[in-house]
Amino acid sequence: MSRKQLALFEPTLVVQALKEAVKKLNPQAQWRNPVMFIVWIGSLLTTCISIAMASGAMPGNALFSAAISGWLWVTVLFANFAEALAEGRSKAQANSLKGVKKTAFARKLREPKYGAAADKVPADQLRKGDIVLVEAGDIIPCDGEVIEGGASVDESAITGESAPVIRESGGDFASVTGGTRILSDWLVIECSVNPGETFLDRMIAMVEGAQRRKTPNEIALTILLIALTIVFLLATATLWPFSAWGGNAVSVTVLVALLVCLIPTTIGGLLSAIGVAGMSRMLGANVIATSGRAVEAAGDVDVLLLDKTGTITLGNRQASEFIPAQGVDEKTLADAAQLASLADETPEGRSIVILAKQRFNLRERDVQSLHATFVPFTAQSRMSGINIDNRMIRKGSVDAIRRHIEANGGHFPTDVDQKVDQVARQGATPLVVVEGSRVLGVIALKDIVKGGIKERFAQLRQMGIKTVMITGDNRLTAAAIAAEAGVDDFLAEATPEAKLALIRQYQAEGRLVAMTGDGTNDAPALAQADVAVAMNSGTQAAKEAGNMVDLDSNPTKLIEVVHIGKQMLMTRGSLTTFSIANDVAKYFAIIPAAFAATYPQLNALNIMRLHSPDSAILSAVIFNALIIVFLIPLALKGVSYKPLTASAMLRRNLWIYGLGGLLVPFIGIKVIDLLLTVCGLV
């Protein structure tokens, strides 16, 4: 991705976030975060008390009360700032996307064909089903499907990649995105969405997160935080009569300070920022998530369905050998294989034509001049070929050719079965060539497993994630490649129906499944999967079925998506642990300061030897506010992620964030107390 990455504290974003933090001080905005709403009420209450003390309407230390009140307002502002900064980063990314949208006109065709009469209309008036013509230099005005033509398209405004891509009618490369530019030739496009519903519009809406809903885990954590807040609120409320009965009633200002320091304000103030930042980090990986729920689900995934081609292997299978059947010479097999591949534009098909040319000097022949009919490959038939004169030549998977022969009254030879097994055991893909009902032999297609992929799968296994390779190869080939790559399981001879059934099977076992896809035939499985990453180069149906879109169209990105999801969950859990552990030090700071006058025995808890009750309480409140600011970078960037088992991860986080949450406040509160004392502020 070539887009400029935002600095963590971009000056313009910080200024805007500070303004938004002040705007969020209104009760309606605060009510959405129950923990910080309690702090907001406490700030308001102590402000009123400070004013009353200053005017003489109430007895007490007005300066101390004002200091507490001021730092409580700062606490609320810092929490608002964290959320506003995260939202500001997302909106800045959205603004870069808005720059792609241009007010333009489109040539709307009156008939769905090239050369038809056209009307010039504003692009924002195009409706679903309208037909438009775009030529070299034009901006594509809407999302749609190419129904005629082929062109080179610059998609860098959307994907960040400068290399142009080919878009043409038919197949999985017919989908185009509004806002991209035609570099050469022309396309006739059928609009697939109405105004405001384009992929670019949805990207902007998703990134801005204006309607961001809380995820299930976020809701569960919020409920826990509310429960803790209620417990501490009730406990604090009982302390006033408790101290009054002892003969020295503690002030309301001190009780509010105690309450604010005990409730989990750290995670309460950063919770929204963590959620927004998770989606922002996903965008940083060039993946657009439809919601925070999708990002969170990625963190809970325990089954990955990975396409073999392009994900596990390099994806450039090449014909490496012609293996003739008994009684057939190799040149006859090569000639038939080349004829069956003349109109096959896949890399495999072109490699078969080239291999026949190299081995036997068989030159390419024009399908039209031969008066031949090309039979295209389909996911259901699993074979392709050519009909020429009285010859019917097909090439395809072993099972598909076997069914084809038996349907034509033929018999699949035993020696070819042996040759197929031999090719498959070597990790190559066997394609069988047949003419009529006579098997001519086998073509070996060789692919290479990506370097380092086995180690990545070992890491995923250590994390408790099962990897399943999806391939159209036969079981022997699939087993050989699966063993070489180190995946846990595989689905061979996969059809769209088989993928859908496999996903449902895992989900019935209580597992969360993630997969990638780019074709229309992937849409049912993408719609069923818990995390479905559609390729931006794929069809409109695939992108609509998925809950994420990878702008780089890189199937391997699924592993990174899972890492980002887990990092978001870890960040939330780690900061929750840190926030709750913080309370221990605050007990030792505020409890002796507030109640030692009534119960001198509580002085034993003043292990930090803080200067005075006022400095102890003020130091705890100041630390409580400042820690939010210090943790903002961690909330936005996420905690350091390492692929470990769940138990090892728990131990690591308890040591770092649990123990850290215990020790840091002791040090921080003591340092603040010393500074207040040295400066003569208490």
UniProtKB/Swiss-Prot annotation:
Its EC number is 7.2.2.6. Signal peptide: none annotated. Its main location: membrane. It is an enzyme of class 7 (translocase). Keywords: ATP-binding, Cell inner membrane, Cell membrane, Ion transport, Magnesium, Membrane, Metal-binding, Nucleotide-binding, Phosphoprotein, Potassium, Potassium transport, Translocase, Transmembrane, Transmembrane helix, Transport. Gene3D superfamilies: Calcium-transporting ATPase, cytoplasmic domain N (3.40.1110.10), Calcium-transporting ATPase, cytoplasmic transduction domain A (2.70.150.10), HAD superfamily/HAD-like (3.40.50.1000). The keyword Protein transport does not apply. Mg(2+) binds at residues 518, 522. The active site is at residue 307. It is a multi-pass membrane protein. GO terms for cellular component: plasma membrane. InterPro entries: ATPase_P-typ_cyto_dom_N (IPR023299), ATPase_P-typ_P_site (IPR018303), ATPase_P-typ_TM_dom_sf (IPR023298), ATPase_P-typ_transduc_dom_A_sf (IPR008250), HAD-like_sf (IPR036412), HAD_sf (IPR023214), P-type_ATPase_bsu_IA (IPR006391), P_typ_ATPase (IPR001757). HAMAP family: KdpB (MF_00285). Belongs to the cation transport ATPase (P-type) (TC 3.A.3) family. Type IA subfamily. This is Potassium-transporting ATPase ATP-binding subunit. It comes from Escherichia coli (strain 55989 / EAEC). The gene is kdpB.
